[in-house]
C-alpha cells in the first residue's frame, strides 16, 4: 500500500471516519473476523457515494489485500476510500447524494432528524454515544432547527469529498 494514502487517512476528520465506519459495519455484521468480502466492497463504496468501475475496484482490492484473503479490514478500507476520494476529484454526484439523503430520511419528510440519524448509526452495530450522535447532528444542522435539510446535507457532505 502506498504510504501517501496511509498518511491521507490520518487527515480524515472524525466525522468522515465515523461515516465510513458506519457503512463498513453494515456489511460486516455477520462476519466473525471483522472484515468484509471483496464482493461486498463495491456495495459499501456505492453506499458512500463512490462509484468505482469493476476494474478500479479490483485494482484497489489487489493493492490492499496483501495476504490474498479475499477480505478487507476497516484500516484497509479507509486507505481504499481515501484513494477513491482522491481519484474522484468531482466528488459525489447530485444523484448519489440525493440517494444517500433519502436513505437517512426514513419518513421522507425532507429532513434528517436526530432520531433518523440515530437509527442509521445504530444500525451499524457500532457502539456510538448519544453525545457522538448529537455532535454529528450539530455539525450538519447549520440553521439550528434540530434537523438537517437537503441543502445542509449537501454542505456537510462536501467535507467528506
Swiss-Prot record:
Is Nucleotide-binding given among the entry's keywords? no
Q: At what positions is N-acetylmethionine found?
A: 1
**Annotated keywords:** Acetylation, Calcium, Metal-binding, Muscle protein, Phosphoprotein, Repeat
Can you tell me which residues bind Ca(2+) 2?
105, 107, 109, 111, 116
The family database entries (InterPro entries) matched by this protein are listed as: CALM/Myosin/TropC-like, EF-hand-dom_pair, EF_Hand_1_Ca_BS, EF_hand_dom
Entry-linked CDD domains: EFh
- Modified positions (Phosphoserine) in chain numbering: 98
Gene3D superfamilies in alphabetical order: EF-hand
Q: Which GO terms describe its biological process?
A: cardiac muscle contraction; regulation of muscle filament sliding speed; skeletal muscle contraction; transition between fast and slow fiber; ventricular cardiac muscle tissue morphogenesis
Binding of Ca(2+) 1: at which residues? 65, 67, 69, 71, 76
Q: Where does Ca(2+) 3 bind?
A: 141, 143, 145, 147, 152
Q: SMART domains in the record, alphabetically?
A: EFh (SM00054)
Give me the Gene Ontology terms describing cellular component: cardiac Troponin complex
Segments forming domain EF-hand: 16-51, 52-87, 92-127, 128-161
Q: Does the keyword Repeat apply?
A: yes
Instruction: Report the transmembrane regions from the record.
Output: none
Q: Which PANTHER family match?
A: MYOSIN LIGHT CHAIN 1, 3, TROPONIN C1, SLOW SKELETAL AND CARDIAC TYPE
What's the family? Belongs to the troponin C family.
Physiological role: Troponin is the central regulatory protein of striated muscle contraction. Tn consists of three components: Tn-I which is the inhibitor of actomyosin ATPase, Tn-T which contains the binding site for tropomyosin and Tn-C. The binding of calcium to Tn-C abolishes the inhibitory action of Tn on actin filaments.
What is the protein's given name? Troponin C, slow skeletal and cardiac muscles
Provide the species name.
Sus scrofa (Pig)
Gene of this entry: TNNC1
